[in-house]
Swiss-Prot record:
Binding positions (thiamine diphosphate): H80, G121, H122, S123, G153, A154, N181, Y288, E371
Pfam families (alphabetical): DXP_synthase_N, Transket_pyr, Transketolase_C
Official protein name in the record: 1-deoxy-D-xylulose-5-phosphate synthase
Cystine crosslinks: none
Gene Ontology BP annotations: 1-deoxy-D-xylulose 5-phosphate biosynthetic process; isopentenyl diphosphate biosynthetic process, methylerythritol 4-phosphate pathway; terpenoid biosynthetic process; thiamine biosynthetic process
HAMAP family the UniProt entry points to: DXP_synth
Presence of the UniProt keyword Magnesium in the record: yes
Assembly behavior: Homodimer.
UniProt cofactor note: Binds 1 Mg(2+) ion per subunit.
Superkingdom field: Bacteria
Length: 621
């Protein structure tokens, strides 16, 4: 996509924030209009996160206009909303490559630009990192300022409050901008969000603000003071807010789409000392009516036609996603068991739980972005005699590792972890690949871990884990569609038993997970035995011993880090039993895997059928 200077005459003048700061203030609204339109044109052609960026156009322009970036540090939380930031910081002409192999990173990324001071992707990290930068800036003594932008969903996480509590204690100069669009990926929950959403419409707030302005503006000597401290008058209306109790000077709420007023407010705040919190109200999807009306569906989008106002529908006959299979299993199980309790940390849509949340609202809990709480909450439900299911992405389960060990596994509580997005996720890059869950779960005592090879096996494993009441279980499945296999009635699988799918000679391919179709092709060409191992823990030790008697080579296959993964478990067993079998471990290498489509990444890593065959052939030479 070439940049059309005639269509975007003001944006054409702004390649970097230095050029932005040369513009007269009255041209900023025009710049925002063009920036929003350019974002729409670009993302509709390339796919990507969409609604969040539309809502932060004015904030992004105002921040770069007022603050001396990159000398001043601007820290974005999560990064979904940072597309306008990328466009204004030297990456305008490459924005159409975002989330693609070799293209712009989907989130702010330190290796990509000096304006991206923190690499992000997971939520609620900005204030902690920003506080560290603010302390470093104080020691440096050069007047560097630090600003953190965090959304109303991300600020509900415990880490954000830990950071604010610390900031209020040490009193470093730090600005936190709370971007309140009343809508994170799933609807926000909890008393804090209700409080924030009600502030702007309060009659007391509005009348006191206007009354205070009239009284003070009638005194000529302090007119300028009124301009500089109007924000403080707003803060006076809500004394004792949670933020002020944490030691922040709370200012707001203010209109996040009035770029000139926002720039004025930020300019005033730049000189304030100590921790400051600016609360802005924005509209997710601002400027594009379909996204404003349905910001959840338009949060992340495929390529689409902006004129149609609709997203492309799934292809007819497409196989169901694993997330949908999970949601259907939840429905089927809840219909028979009122003690099922399903828990998600703010990922209702992505985890396939929308219909379940509507049909079984009393058995559904969205705990917001609070993975640690989600796991320990599940532990409490299990203690109380209920049957909790924690639906969580692999990459986000990392955030609750201690809770899995301390609150669930040590107490041997029957909690089922439905781990979505295991393995290669694709376009979201390093922060979202599900590369480590088998490794970090396998070493936990009492944990049973299952890896389905297709959607029917996924259903059966969820059923098996749910009815296993002797301790915690995990079923780990990928992003994407199933294979089209027939769905059979639910029945419990024997724990720790694999299935031989093909009988061959010399080589036994031990598959863990959904790479089975690729392994099948390689096995046919190599005349290898193919085993669907099903269980990472416990391993089918009897089957491994049997195979070791008739095969000289084992090849373990998994879409997880090789280090510590399922293949490592096979190695450990063979060594412990002194079984003389050569082993090739195939999986994810010891690197953070960048963005690309799932197919591109698997091909690059040799995890497609041709790559698996090639790795085995080369190793056997």
């Amino acid at each position: 996509m070439s940049f059309d200077t005639a269509k975007y005459p003001t944006l054409a003048l702004v390649e970097t924030p230095d050029e932005l700061r040369l513009l007269p203030k009255d041209s900023l609204p025009k710049l925002c209009d063009e920036l929003r339109q350019y974002l729409l044109d670009s993302v509709s052609r390339s796919s990507g996160h969409f609604a969040s960026g539309l809502g932060t156009v004015e904030l992004t322009v105002a921040l770069h206009y007022v603050y001396n970036t990159p000398f001043d540090h601007l820290v974005w939380d999560v990064g979904h909303q940072a597309y306008p930031h990328k466009i204004l910081t030297g990456r305008r002409d490459r924005i159409s490559t975002i989330r693609q192999k070799g293209g712009l990173h989907p989130f702010p990324w330190r290796d990509e630009s000096e304006y991206d001071v923190l690499s992000v992707g997971h939520s609620s990290t900005s204030i902690s990192a920003g506080l560290g930068m603010a302390v470093a800036a104080e020691r440096e003594g050069k007047g560097r300022r630090t600003v953190c932008v965090i959304g109303d969903g991300a600020i509900t996480a415990g880490m954000a409050f830990e950071a604010m509590n610390h900031a209020g204690d040490i009193r470093s100069d730090l600005l936190v901008v709370l971007n309140d669009n009343e809508m994170s990926i799933s609807e926000n929950v909890g008393a804090l969000n209700n409080h924030l959403a009600q502030l702007l419409s309060g009659k007391l707030y509005a009348s006191l603000r206007e009354g205070g302005k009239k009284v003070l503006s009638g005194l000529p000597p302090i007119k300028e003071l009124v301009k500089r401290t109007e924000e403080h008058l707003k803060g006076m209306v809500v004394p004792g807010t949670l933020f002020e109790e944490l030691g922040f000077n709370y200012i707001g709420p203010v209109d996040g789409h009035d770029v000139q007023a926002l720039a004025h407010t930020l300019k005033n705040m730049r000189s304030l000392k100590g921790p400051q919190l600016l609360h802005i109200m924005t509209k997710k999807g601002k400027g594009y009516a379909p996204a404003e009306q349905d910001p959840i569906s338009w949060h992340a989008v495929p390529k689409f036609d902006p004129a149609s106002g609709t997203l492309p529908k799934s292809k007819e006959g497409a196989q169901p996603t694993y997330s949908k299979i999970f949601g259907q299993w939840l429905q089927e199980t809840a219909a028979k068991d009122s003690k099922l309790m399903a828990i998600t940390p703010a990922m209702r849509e992505g985890s396939g739980m929308v219909q379940f949340s509507r049909d079984y609202p009393q058995q559904y809990f969205d705990v917001a972005i609070a993975e640690q709480h989600a796991v320990t909450f599940a532990a409490g439900l299990a203690v109380g005699g209920y049957h909790p299911v924690v639906a969580i992405y692999s990459t986000f389960l990392q955030r609750a590792y201690d809770q899995v060990i301390h609150d669930v596994a040590i107490q041997n509580l029957p909690v089922l972890f439905a781990i979505d997005r295991g393995g290669i996720v694709g376009a979201d890059g390093q922060t979202h690949q599900g590369a480590f869950d088998l490794s970090f779960l396998r070493c936990i005592p009492n944990m049973i871990i299952m890896t389905p090879s297709d959607e029917n096996e996924c259903r059966q494993m969820l059923h098996t884990g749910y009815h296993y009441q002797k301790g915690p279980t995990a079923v780990r499945y990928p992003r994407g569609n199933g294979t089209g296999t027939e769905l059979t009635p639910l029945s419990e699988l024997p724990i720790g038993k694999g299935v031989v799918r093909r009988q061959g000679e010399t080589i036994a391919i031990l598959n863990f997970g959904t790479l089975l179709p690729e392994a099948q092709i390689a096995a046919e060409k190599l005349n290898a035995t193919l085993v669907d191992m099903r269980f990472v823990k416990p391993l089918d030790e009897a089957l491994l011993e049997e195979l070791a008697q008739s095969h000289s080579t084992f090849v373990t296959l998994e879409e997880n880090a090789i280090m510590g993964g399922a293949g490592s478990g096979v190695n450990e067993f063979l060594m412990a039993k002194r079984l003389a079998v050569s082993v090739l471990n195939i999986g994810l290498p010891d690197v953070f895997i960048p963005q690309g489509s799932q197919e591109e990444i698997r091909a690059d890593l040799g995890l497609d059928a041709a790559g698996i065959e090639r790795k085995i052939t080369q190793w056997m030479e």
